[in-house]
Regions:
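Protein kinase glycine-rich loop
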Residues: 21-27, 32
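AlphaC helix of the eukaryotic protein kinase fold
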Residues: 59-93
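Activation-segment/catalytic-loop signature of the eukaryotic protein kinase fold
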Residues: 104-105
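Conserved short submotifs of the Hanks-type protein kinase catalytic core
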Residues: 108-123, 127
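Activation segment signature within eukaryotic-like protein kinase domains
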Residues: 142-143
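Protein kinase catalytic-loop region centered on the HRD/HxD motif
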Residues: 146-158
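C-terminal lobe helix-coil module of Hanks-type protein kinase domains
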Residues: 202-298
């Protein structure tokens, strides 16, 4: 991908450990780089908080990000805090096979970075653009790790709030992973404060259009079922707001597609306009979709090997960082990062010495 004037230059070293090797993707809120972890000698993806339109950087002279839009410094700092919160959320689920792993995060250059595992593959959106549809039976098997990961997310009182084909990675070996936790929130606090509005037409249920909409696991279940609907039919799911007036959601079988009544009914129920009519948790959804969540978990991704479904491709990550008020930062300070650079430099030198002997 072609780099712009604001991207870090190839060869830039971050905290003495990560070397920038190129640009993977750019979005309205940031830049994603291909990087090299010099300590472990492996490729990584590095997300940089860089909200376009309010910041700049002159890479001819420095790597530091500068806020240029008058009056936006406070919003920039809040957005950076949310960005680091995303890393913290991802790190909570680093052992889940269905979630992209966050390996590291830190502040430097007056901005913030998240280091993630580098995945070769395509987004589900890109895959569907090339292949149109996925057979229903194949899809429900592929989704097992992601659904189990979503259940774990909900068990921690969190909801993702942005599940859609462009936030799911499909890997060359057939595995899929959920990414982009920029919109994740603690749903257990919805009674005390409103959740900010985050929506993607077709995948967002009605409660996400409302400032004080009551969101919970049922919100993610709607988005997941809408994503499944898109995968199986090849058609974009209708906007939930339009369905409030005239619910014209076609059943999957109405497209002339072969699908078991069990799968179809579970997806359609999960896409119910009224939250009370949807599944209230992942376990109940899986009970209908698979005929027994616990049984399916035992047969999950650890024992079954999915057939390859895509060719290798580079990752292009979307940034979606909100600027809302958050608690005082608990992330690494500039002094801590500088101290860490010294330790990393020492370890790299020692490793180099061992290699040369």
């Amino acid at each position: 991908m072609e780099e712009n004037l604001y991207c870090l230059r190839k060869g830039t070293r971050l905290i003495g450990r990560y070397t920038v090797e190129g640009v993977l993707g750019q979005g309205g809120f940031g830049i994603t780089y291909l990087g090299m972890d010099e300590l472990h000698k492996k490729k990584v993806a590095i997300k940089e908080f860089f909200p376009q339109g309010i910041v700049t950087r002159n890479i001819e002279y420095e790597d530091t990000v500068t806020v240029t839009l008058v009056g936006e410094k406070e919003n920039y700092d809040k957005g950076k805090e949310r960005f680091l919160k995303e890393a913290q959320t991802m790190a909570m689920f680093s052992k889940d096979k269905g979630i992209v792993k966050a390996l590291d995060f830190f502040e430097i250059n007056n901005t913030a970075y998240i280091v993630m595992e580098y995945l070769e593959g395509v987004t589900l959106k890109q895959y569907l653009r090339e292949n149109k549809r996925i057979a229903a039976e194949d899809l429900v098997e592929l989704l097992v790790p992601l659904i189990e990961a979503l259940d774990e997310i909900h068990s921690q009182g969190l909801i993702h709030r942005d599940i859609s084909p462009d936030n799911i990675m499909v890997l060359p070996d057939g595995r899929i992973k959920l990414m982009d936790f920029g919109a994740a929130r603690d749903y257990t606090e919805f009674g005390e404060k409103s959740l900010s509005i985050v929506l993607k037409p077709g995948y967002a249920p009605p409660e996400q259009y409302q400032t004080h909409g009551v969101q919970g696991p049922w919100t993610d279940i709607y988005a997941l079922c809408a994503t499944m609907y898109k995968c199986i039919t090849g058609e974009n799911p209708p906007d939930a707001i339009d369905r409030l007036v005239d619910d014209h959601l076609k059943k999957i079988s109405a497209f002339g597609i072969t699908v078991s009544p069990q799968i179809e009914e579970a997806i359609i129920k999960g896409m119910s306009v009224a939250a009370k009519d949807r599944y209230q948790n992942v376990g109940d959804f899986c009970e209908d979709l698979y005929g027994g969540y616990e049984e399916r978990s035992v047969l999950g991704a650890e024992e079954s090997q999915a057939e390859p479904v895509v060719a290798e491709a580079n990752v292009e990550t979307k940034m979606d960082v909100l600027t809302e008020e958050t608690p005082q930062s608990k992330y690494p300070t500039t002094e801590a990062v500088q101290e860490r650079e010294k330790l990393i430099s020492k370890e790299l030198s020692e490793n180099a010495g061992l290699t040369s002997e």
